[in-house]
Design a protein with these regions (language model features):
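Catalytic, metal-anchored helix/loop core of enzyme active sites in primary metabolism
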Residues: 89, 97, 119, 128
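ASCE RecA-like P-loop NTPase motor cores
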Residues: 17-22, 132, 139-143
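Conserved P-loop
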Residues: 18-96
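Conserved ATPase-coupling elements of RecA-like P-loop NTPase cores
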Residues: 106-121, 139-140, 145
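Short amphipathic alpha-helical segments and helix-helix/interface helices
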Residues: 41, 121-128
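Pre-Walker A adenine-sensing motif
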Residues: 1-17
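Loop/turn-to-beta-strand initiation segments
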Residues: 50, 98-101, 127-136
């Protein structure tokens, strides 16, 4: 049990400096949250900020796909579930790469079985605790009041 806990927290930073969270918010799928996040990433990159794509839901939108060009992208974690391959954020790769800003699409996503956390927001919390800032997206229907 202790070994498992230590392995899961090997990238945890004792530094008081936590990452910042920037949320691109929208009312529905397809309104341009991911597009706006990628545009902001290019602007940050032009200012010399170390920014990396951790996970982007591609949705085969040509304009969105084009904005991925020129940005470093981490390989996605492939998880097999009921005979199909699912793509997830590779949290360990992100923590090891340690960019200033990491792009992580769909904050409200439920991770596949086999991932460290059941929800993507938990991945983001771990990244923030490690001092990595995160740009992410969320739709209003995923919020609770």
């Amino acid at each position: 049990m202790l070994e498992s806990y230590q392995a899961q927290n090997q990238y945890h930073s004792d530094s008081p400096q936590k990452g910042n969270l920037k949320i691109f918010f929208g009312y529905a799928a397809g309104v341009g949250k991911t597009y706006a996040m990628l545009e902001a990433a290019h602007q940050a990159q032009k200012r010399g900020i170390d920014i990396v794509v951790g996970y982007i839901e591609r949705h085969t939108r040509p304009d969105t796909l084009a904005l991925l060009e020129g940005l470093e992208q981490l390989p996605e974690k492939i998880v097999e579930y009921k005979g199909i391959e699912l793509k997830e954020l590779d949290l360990d790769a992100a923590l090891q790469r340690r960019p200033t800003i990491l792009l992580v699409d769909e904050l409200a996503h439920s991770n596949a079985a086999g991932c460290r956390h059941s929800k993507r927001y938990q991945d983001v919390e771990e990244l923030l605790r490690a001092g990595i800032s995160v740009y992410t997206t969320v739709n209003v229907q995923h919020l609770e009041s």
